[in-house]
Amino acid sequence: MSGIDFKQKISVQRPFGKPSSAEDEYEITRVFESDRGRIVNSAAIRRLQQKTQVFPLERNAAVRSRLTHSLEVQQVGRYIAKEILNRFKQDKKISAYGLDKLLDPFESIVEMACLMHDIGNPPFGHFGESAINNWFTKQMDPNGGGAEPRGKDQCLVNTLKLREGETELNILRSKIRQDLSHFEGNAQAIRLVYSLLKLNLTYAQVGCILKYTKPAYWSGDIPTSHNYLMKKPGFYLAEEEYVKDLRRELNMGEFNRFPLTYIMEAADDISYCIADLEDAVEKNIFSVEQLYDHMVQEWGETTHGDLFDKVVGGAFRQLGRGQGRRSSEDQFFMYLRVNTVGKLVPHAAQRFIENLPAVFSGSFNQALLEDSSPACKLLQIFKKVAVKHVFNYPEVEQLELQGYRVISGLLDIYSPLLAMPQTAFTQLVAEDSHREYPIETRLFHKLSTKHRLAYAESTERLRHLSPEQHEIYEYYYRARLIQDYISGMTDLYAYDEYRRLMAAE
């Protein structure tokens, strides 16, 4: 397979500071060890311990948080990476693929991407995400955009309303209305590491968490060749120039992926499907015996020695055999995890290698664990059981509805900051106070320093723009400021903050 050279992809360069001159193996490894240190010690990773996996506001430490889930994904990602590299070694392809000095970085990039993959998720998971998008959609009317007004503009933000004869400005307004109405955890992760936390990670490390390749402002048809890669927003307008630099540095086509991202995605798929079921048993939603019946029902007719019998049946037959050493539930899930990982990891590695040219270029338009194989069927039945019997459980649904209300309520509470005239908000930022806006001043004081600094830095770069463009972009970064602050909260902090500000305690 000529043309595959991982030296073109695993770049040691960073967006800030002088270019790296690392050439020997240990120098290159040190670059990515620095990435590891920056990531592991970041506040975003620590906050994962109080963010929802499936069960919001969970007090039982045995039930997974985003952090414990991410640690499990990290381990599976490392395993897949090692499996791929071992097969390259067996086929004597290490040198041919430019990996002589990159074996440790290959693994490290995957591991750290797995650890980071959920850092952009807001409180209360997908329901928090939906709350942000629905709130901003009502404000923005993103589908009413265009180059010229068409009838009554339903946008509630005067700065972003379309105006006759302002074609270029209307295109910008429409783009920003789309962008702000499409908050997405993966795009927020890119924003976190680059704009908010300023971790200055290598382009390769950040490229590995660019899971989807569509900008959040996208409003046109999606090319069929990239309909999977572009099914969700992957980055915001605010980070567009950075993503362009990243693509140049990593030799990525416009809507293509970084090759190691496929491994991170497969590790997540393998990990969460088992974890959600184990947590459901821990929460007494169903017993192991009931879970087994649910899985048999989804699989259909089983035969002795088929994949279901080996993986799920094999685990079920271990029930009770470990008594005195561990509980029957622990026994079952230990074997289920071992059996599942033992089958799906080699399958993911094989799919990576079989499709290497497309994977390397980043144009492979599906997940590694998305084919007609029994391994993928097994993964799908795990997911179906979770959807049918876990996600719609009354306790889960009630907590998700509470989470939706909390995030929507916080956006309502902080919305006066978005309603301020540009000049007044600029004065508030500069002076940390505004006598005519006492409520807004107090709300502004509650915003975190790093988010306020990111806003100030972004608006500082707008000086060269026309007054009309400046006003539009200023509102954009102000809305981003509110999204950044609320999405960065933990579940418990968001819940407590909402109760405090609603005078409910």
Swiss-Prot record:
Cofactor(s) it depends on: Mg(2+)
SUPFAM superfamilies: HD-domain/PDEase-like
A biological-process GO annotation: dGTP catabolic process
Lineage: superkingdom: Bacteria
SMART domains: HDc
Domain HD: 66-273
Residue spans crossing the bilayer: none
Classification via Pfam families: HD (PF01966), HD_assoc (PF13286)
GO-annotated molecular function: dGTPase activity; magnesium ion binding
Keyword Magnesium on entry: yes
Subunit record text: Homotetramer.
Function (record text): dGTPase preferentially hydrolyzes dGTP over the other canonical NTPs.
Name listed for the protein in its UniProt record: Deoxyguanosinetriphosphate triphosphohydrolase
Source species of the chain: Yersinia enterocolitica serotype O:8 / biotype 1B (strain NCTC 13174 / 8081)
